[in-house]
Amino acid sequence: MTKSVDTLLIPGPIILSGAVQKALDVPSLGHTSPEFVSIFQRVLKNTRAVFKSAAASKSQPFVLAGSGTLGWDIFASNFILSKAPNKNVLVVSTGTFSDRFADCLRSYGAQVDVVRPLKIGESVPLELITEKLSQNSYGAVTVTHVDTSTAVLSDLKAISQAIKQTSPETFFVVDAVCSIGCEEFEFDEWGVDFALTASQKAIGAPAGLSISLCSSRFMDYALNDSKNGHVHGYFSSLRRWTPIMENYEAGKGAYFATPPVQLINSLDVALKEILEEGLHKRWDLHREMSDWFKDSLVNGLQLTSVSRYPSNMSAHGLTAVYVADPPDVIAFLKSHGVVIAGGIHKDIGPKYIRIGHMGVTACNKNLPYMKNCFDLIKLALQRKK
């Protein structure tokens, strides 16, 4: 007998499309076989395309076994080199995951300054970032494009311009775990030097892959051992992984550590789905679903959004709203087969709920996931009156 499966509407992992789910159910392939090399070659090329980077820019994609968090370690270990000329990092924090990135950087020896918004649920004012850049010399600025703890969306284009005008030598680093695939993202145009994401959110693949893209400028820095010294890491070393990725993209098998072949096969299908639909259309679909869902909760049910809504500070792949009794609402939805998430921000965690709307739940309007979720939240709140 088949057991019914709950509708998963947390901010990742997300519900997979039928084709992506099916791509997991394939026999194991040799990781240097012609069949797998062809798949991985396409994945690397399409990864660059989804980040909006041209091959001519000589940006380098990396797809490794691991979670999105591994991306922090990859950047930190290849930036904080033994002879790194500038270990100062400005972290633009809009929530829990921004702060965790800062903790990761400190663990490698970075000198970290953190700039925060005036109020939880808002983005950091651009003038505060510019002021910090004017006062201090930073080797890198990190921005969490969408902080999943608050559903705050940062304006990468504006921050990029501020860095270029105030401190052009500073690396621009973006945690795009909850934005690639659902938010406008322009790696080349915005001058991003290092961007990291994961497979299980808006990309629409299973959890288990850490996906990064490095600019040629950052690659020149990270690979220069004679000038900048050795890497404080082994698995995370770009010096070890770069020839592997270059060979796979050139259609040649290579080996450093065994890649998860089934996960990469499913990522291949997920990336093709995104590109076949079109990035701009996909961004629009996420925006439309997000606006409808937030408007229904904020204006329809008179709930307060954690991220300011309506505004350009509110993410399109998830919604965070304050409710009187989050555990009760979460339990009620669970009893009806819908799984949502609670809050995790250290200051407001017990006060709000989070709902993900990425991938098929946002892009396929024939599926009733979000309408059902809204109806259940409405019922849960009416029960408490």
From Swiss-Prot:
A cellular component term, taken from the record's GO annotations: mitochondrion
Keyword match ATP-binding: no
Single GO molecular function: L-serine-pyruvate transaminase activity
N6-(pyridoxal phosphate)lysine, modified sites: 201
Cited InterPro entries: Aminotrans_V_dom, PyrdxlP-dep_Trfase, PyrdxlP-dep_Trfase_major, PyrdxlP-dep_Trfase_small, SP_NH2Trfase/AEP_transaminase
Cofactor: pyridoxal 5'-phosphate
Catalytic activity: glyoxylate + L-alanine = glycine + pyruvate
Alphabetized UniProt keyword annotations: Aminotransferase, Pyridoxal phosphate, Transferase
Highest rank taxon of the organism: Eukaryota
Keyword RNA-binding recorded: no
EC number(s) reported in the record: 2.6.1.44
Pathways involved: Amino-acid biosynthesis; glycine biosynthesis; glycine from glyoxylate: step 1/1
Binding site for substrate: 354
GO terms, biological process: glycine biosynthetic process, by transamination of glyoxylate
Consequence of gene disruption: Alanine:glyoxylate aminotransferase activity is reduced by 98% relative to wild-type.
EC top class, as a word: transferase
Note: Present with 339 molecules/cell in log phase SD medium. Expression levels higher in stationary phase than in exponential growth phase when grown in complex medium with glucose.
Family that this chain belongs to: Belongs to the class-V pyridoxal-phosphate-dependent aminotransferase family.
Assembly: Homodimer.
The protein's role, per its UniProt record: Has alanine:glyoxylate aminotransferase activity.
Protein name: Alanine--glyoxylate aminotransferase 1
Organism field: Saccharomyces cerevisiae (strain ATCC 204508 / S288c)
